[in-house]
């Protein structure tokens, strides 16, 4: 779809300082006979211009040709048609680890070089994200919430509420809540022979989020359907052109999907407010309660409170549940890993319930989680926008330039010699430090819930794997599982044939976890 530029190779600046200096010295010390003063002055000016030219940035970023506007159109269509993640991988594979494309007519850089990614993540110049203003307004994210809020001042203010909820006392009670929730959902399974694992994980994670951050009764399955519709709308409208929103008959279903979830969350917030007003004593001030207090004091609008709760509720079911699903598939594709995990679980936890003090001892489990996040991440890129002019790796970046950080590709190509092979040894001795490994990002806009996410994943995996061996119906399927990669990597679920791949068998373990692996029926 792209036209290859004739000037595709980068142009490196030529150091002319020494050459010009010698020339000037020669002219001064050994004047050339017959050359007038005017000619000498002209030569001097030309030399000075050459020096100035040699110090300017002249690198041309590789990428598709502009070609009278056809290049920007074709690159934008690729992003719309194949998805942001898929298109980013395509351009990095074709042009290298720094590529220039266009999205909706705006110049966009795709970076998968670790030093460039690290520069952007750590720099306060890139605390803004890019996306369609009208699309974000549809989602309620335009200058609201935390995920795509580009009002940096308001975003920093709201971030403090999220930080408080995702650390401290809440983090301490997360293990108990996770173990209780996954156990309750396992106990209510209708059949162990045909388990919709992705739905199980989504409902479990939603229940955990509700207990920690909202704590009101809700219908998990009904709310999960609304969350899935909202997420699909999020993917569909994020980089759509403004003309797309001119035709109501085109985007009506998207408007309906977002409104349904927003109304549902608003009802839950209203219920929480009512419970607080009727309570004699508020023993547990959770995330939603803090936001309601902020609204009562005029610090946040009602719409912002609803959006913050919405984003907190959907964040984990959207990403963490899918990460766990991919981990279970990778576990079955790499059968040598399961005995290592079970041996550690038996040694650290035994037959009792997982506790907070056990988490740091689960080193094999931690290596497994990190390797899964590196090998097949749910979200393998990050979107940013330059707030002022900058230079990245010698390339001049103008204010307003869009940036896509292709961390998924970076993880596979920049640190490990065999990054395309699943191997726990990648993380056995020590976790690679930034800028090499960025599963949660870093810097001012890093994932604020990264510590809680690790606690939740460890708690759910330990509780599940200590009781069941999870088996796929048709063998290892992750590589051939139908997936899309737009805003995140998602298995295709809208077709019955693909949905069957999402079901697994849960085989109960008898006695020691390690002993059950020797059972030939497993």
From Swiss-Prot:
- Residue stretches spanning the membrane: none
**Keyword Phosphoprotein listed:** no
Q: Which residues bind heme?
A: 447
Enzyme class name: oxidoreductase
Its principal location?
Answer: membrane
* Catalysis performed (reactions): testosterone + 3 reduced [NADPH--hemoprotein reductase] + 3 O2 = 17beta-estradiol + formate + 3 oxidized [NADPH--hemoprotein reductase] + 4 H2O + 4 H(+); androst-4-ene-3,17-dione + 3 reduced [NADPH--hemoprotein reductase] + 3 O2 = estrone + formate + 3 oxidized [NADPH--hemoprotein reductase] + 4 H2O + 4 H(+)
Concerning CDD domains, the annotation shows:
CYP19A1 (cd20616)
**One of the GO biological process terms:** response to estradiol
Q: One cellular component GO annotation, for this chain's record?
A: endoplasmic reticulum
In the bilayer, the protein is annotated as: Peripheral membrane protein
InterPro entries for this protein: Cyt_P450, Cyt_P450_CS, Cyt_P450_E_grp-I, Cyt_P450_sf, Cytochrome_P450_Monoox
Q: What family does this belong to?
A: Belongs to the cytochrome P450 family.
Question: What name does this protein carry?
Answer: Aromatase
Q: Which organism is it from?
A: Oreochromis niloticus (Nile tilapia)
């Amino acid at each position: 779809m792209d036209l290859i530029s004739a000037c595709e190779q980068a142009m490196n600046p030529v150091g002319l300082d020494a050459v010009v200096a010698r020339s000037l010295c020669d002219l001064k010390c050994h004047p050339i006979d017959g050359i007038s003063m005017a000619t000498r002055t002209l030569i001097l000016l030309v030399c000075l211009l050459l020096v100035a030219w040699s110090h300017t940035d002249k690198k041309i970023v590789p990428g598709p040709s502009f070609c009278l506007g056809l290049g920007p159109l074709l690159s934008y269509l690729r992003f719309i048609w194949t998805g942001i993640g898929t298109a980013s991988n395509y351009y990095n594979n074709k042009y290298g680890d720094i590529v220039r494309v266009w999205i909706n007519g705006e110049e966009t850089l795709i970076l998968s070089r670790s030093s460039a990614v690290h520069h952007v993540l750590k720099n306060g110049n890139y605390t803004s994200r890019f996306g369609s203003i009208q699309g974000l307004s549809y989602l309620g994210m335009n200058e609201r919430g935390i995920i795509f809020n580009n009002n940096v001042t308001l975003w920093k203010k709201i971030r403090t509420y999220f930080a408080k909820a995702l650390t401290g006392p809440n983090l301490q009670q997360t293990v108990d809540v996770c173990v209780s929730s996954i156990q309750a959902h396992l106990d209510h399974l209708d059949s162990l022979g045909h388990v919709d694992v992705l739905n199980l994980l989504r409902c479990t994670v939603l229940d955990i989020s509700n207990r920690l951050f909202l704590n009101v009764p809700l219908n998990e399955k009904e709310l999960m359907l609304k969350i899935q519709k909202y997420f699909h709308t999020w993917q569909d409208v994020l980089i759509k052109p403004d003309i797309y929103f001119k035709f109501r008959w085109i985007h009506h279903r998207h408007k309906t999907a977002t409104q349904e979830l927003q109304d549902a969350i608003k009802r839950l917030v209203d219920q929480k407010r009512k419970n607080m007003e009727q309570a004699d004593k508020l023993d547990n001030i959770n995330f939603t309660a803090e936001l309601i207090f902020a609204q009562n004091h005029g610090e946040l609008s009602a719409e912002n409170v609803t959006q913050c709760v919405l984003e907190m509720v959907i964040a984990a079911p959207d990403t963490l549940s899918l990460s766990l699903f991919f981990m279970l598939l990778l576990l079955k594709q790499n059968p040598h890993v399961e005995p290592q995990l079970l041996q550690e679980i038996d040694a650290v936890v035994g037959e009792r319930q997982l506790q907070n003090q056990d988490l740091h001892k689960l080193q094999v489990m931690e290596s497994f989680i990190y390797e899964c996040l590196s090998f097949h991440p749910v979200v393998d890129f990050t979107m940013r926008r330059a707030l002022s002019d900058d230079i990245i790796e010698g390339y001049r970046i103008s204010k307003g330039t869009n940036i896509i950080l292709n961390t998924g590709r970076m993880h596979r190509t920049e640190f490990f010699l065999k990054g395309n092979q699943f191997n726990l040894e990648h993380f056995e001795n020590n976790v690679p430090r930034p800028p090499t490994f960025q599963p949660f990002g870093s810097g001012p806009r890093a994932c604020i819930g990264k510590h809680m996410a690790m606690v939740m994943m460890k708690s759910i995996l330990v509780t599940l794997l200590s009781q069941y061996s999870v088996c796929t119906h048709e063998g290892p399927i992750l590589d051939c599982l139908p997936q899309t990669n737009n805003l995140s990597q998602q298995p295709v679920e809208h077709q019955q044939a693909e949905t069957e791949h999402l079901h697994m068998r849960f085989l109960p373990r008898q006695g020691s976890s390690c002993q059950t692996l020797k059972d030939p029926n497993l």
